[in-house]
Amino acid sequence: MAIGVPRPLALEKPQSVDLAQAARYFGAHGEPDAATLALLQKCAVPLLAAAMPRAVWLLADTPALTEAGLLPGEDVHKHLAGCGQAILLAVTLGPGVDAQIRRAGVGDIAAGVASDALGSALAEQAADAAEAQLRQWAATEGKYLTRRFSPGYGDWDIAVQPLVAAALDTVRKAGLCVTDTNLMTPRKSVTALLGVSDHPVKGQLAGCGHCVLRTRCEYRKRGKTCASE
């Protein structure tokens, strides 16, 4: 059973980095103080200049993804309930962002951490932009999409990353590789799955019970969840 053909998705670089989101990744609680905001603003300029967003996606029947071993666990199937098809998506900011994060951290640990947080925020913005394009495509096809669901959510183990990358041919299509330990390079990259249906669907968040970050989650420490942010 064939999976879909990977297709590139043209992304424009965001005009700015979401500093509020970056501040949360940086560890700020509530509104960042003036010093934190100034540091983020300073580090955002070279980081944004270094970004070269690329994306690739494919459409496949959910049975084909299951047969290919791409959908292990229960939570991802709950997310895809009512969806006969699904989209696999990969987005990366490119190696320049990783290099800029390393440069920023030389002799200035705070700048390195701030740049890392900014990179995470910018990667999410790029993923949001890619998702917005896919939603436009779905609307023209009379289809409905769930929210994004990424490896590592619930019991959808990150060990699936190499299979996702292979299905999307990310090395050739986006310059995105996966290491032997299932980490993505460039680091500031996002992979995700969205359910596709002919009727409105939302998908189901996995919740905290199975999440691999549940013991060290900053949101849970503040009595919140990532879904509430």
PLM segments and residue spans:
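Active-site helix-to-loop segments that bind/position phosphate- or nucleotide-bearing substrates
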Residues: 1-112
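Metal/cofactor-centered catalytic core regions of large enzymes
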Residues: 74-78, 215-216, 220
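Short terminal or interdomain "cap/linker" segment that borders an active site or interface and mediates
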Residues: 141-219
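Short cysteine/histidine-rich metal-coordination sites, predominantly Zn2+-binding motifs
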Residues: 224-229
